[in-house]
Amino acid sequence: MKYVTPDLCDAYPQLVSVVEPMFQNFGAKSSFGGEIVTVKCFEDNSVVKQQVDQPGHGKVMVVDGGGSKRAALLGDMLAEKAAANGWEGIIIYGCIRDVDVIRQTDLGVQALGTHPMKTDKRGIGDLNADITFGGVTFKPGHYVYADNNGVIVSPEPLSMPQEQ
């Protein structure tokens, strides 16, 4: 489904919280949304790697990488695995790499930027805890919507308004 965040903001002003503008769109899906699954990790993408192996239909992984720009939390292999397992998208408060392949992958991907270095794999990270960045708290089970206009969060699923 295609989401237009300005239209969602207009239709549901009391429900949505808008994330501060900071993300770039990298995936082949420029618009995506779904139920939030959270990962909190810092320069270690072990939990991200575990999660992309899980079924992700109707879900968006939101990764709090602490805003680090010293290593990439997502690369082409993990992005392709996430797409194959049905994830709608991944939003990373951190960096990604392999952007030329990710741009061709059927997945929504937003991140702060790119970095060619991979992370260490120390097995450190938290799954499905509340995380906060960009002035918004992301709660597992709530919903996130993203497009080229920005990222918004809602405690319940939103439908695109009908054109008048």
Curated annotation (Swiss-Prot):
Keywords, comma-separated and alphabetical: Lyase, Metal-binding
Any single biological process term in GO: regulation of RNA metabolic process
Domain of life, source organism: Bacteria
Organism listed in the record: Hahella chejuensis (strain KCTC 2396)
Enzyme class: lyase
Gene3D superfamilies referenced in this protein's UniProt entry, alphabetically: Ribonuclease E inhibitor RraA/RraA-like
Textual note on the cofactor: Divalent metal cation.
Swiss-Prot/TrEMBL cofactor(s): a divalent metal cation
Catalyses which reaction(s): 4-hydroxy-4-methyl-2-oxoglutarate = 2 pyruvate; oxaloacetate + H(+) = pyruvate + CO2
Binding site for a divalent metal cation: D98
Positions with a binding annotation for substrate: G75, D76, M77, L78, R97
The keyword Lyase is annotated on this UniProt entry: yes
Name of the protein described by the UniProt record: Putative 4-hydroxy-4-methyl-2-oxoglutarate aldolase
Lineage: Bacteria, Pseudomonadati, Pseudomonadota, Gammaproteobacteria, Oceanospirillales
Database matches in SUPFAM superfamilies: RraA-like
EC number: 4.1.3.17, 4.1.1.112
GO MF annotation, one: 4-hydroxy-4-methyl-2-oxoglutarate aldolase activity
Family, as annotated: Belongs to the class II aldolase/RraA-like family.
Binding partners and assembly: Homotrimer.
